[in-house]
From Swiss-Prot:
One of its GO terms (cellular component) is cytosol. This is Ribosome-binding factor A. Transmembrane segments: none annotated. Its main location: cytoplasm. It is found in: Cytoplasm. Keywords: Cytoplasm, Ribosome biogenesis.
């Protein structure tokens, strides 16, 4: 990523997250249990992938649909607030990193590692 794409991605992430916090996105499926993790912007600034996580037992398909429906509104608001001549087209993807992390923790906690035997050590 170039400095510009990284800067635009961070600005979009902050703006979308603050819009969620302030309740500017009216869809109730996006309230409370959705977190913006990262935004990756294409080199030509025409597309931005917004990675989000959903906490709890929220309807993930419903959340994806809500993002899709709100994308035009968000693009318009982002263009105005960030003073971009052409705001990138927003694409939303569920970020599975939290799920992977949880699964790895479960696997590590399930390992039965025998205690270290101090009698084998040589001094």
């Amino acid at each position: 990523m170039t400095i510009r794409t990284e800067r635009v991605g961070n600005a979009i992430r902050k703006e979308v997250a603050s819009m969620l916090t302030r309740g500017e996105i009216k869809d109730p499926r996006l309230g409370g249990f959705v977190n913006i993790q990262e935004v990756r912007v294409s080199p030509d600034l025409s597309y931005a992938k917004v990675y989000y996580t959903v906490f709890g037992e929220s309807d993930q398909a419903g959340v994806a649909d809500a993002w899709q429906r709100a994308s035009g509104f968000l693009r318009n608001v982002i263009a105005k607030r960030l003073k971009l001549r052409h705001a990138p087209e927003l694409r939303f993807e569920l970020d599975h990193v939290a799920d992977y992390s949880k699964r790895i923790d479960e696997l590590l906690n399930g390992l039965e590692i025998p205690p270290a035997d101090d009698s084998d050590e040589t001094h």
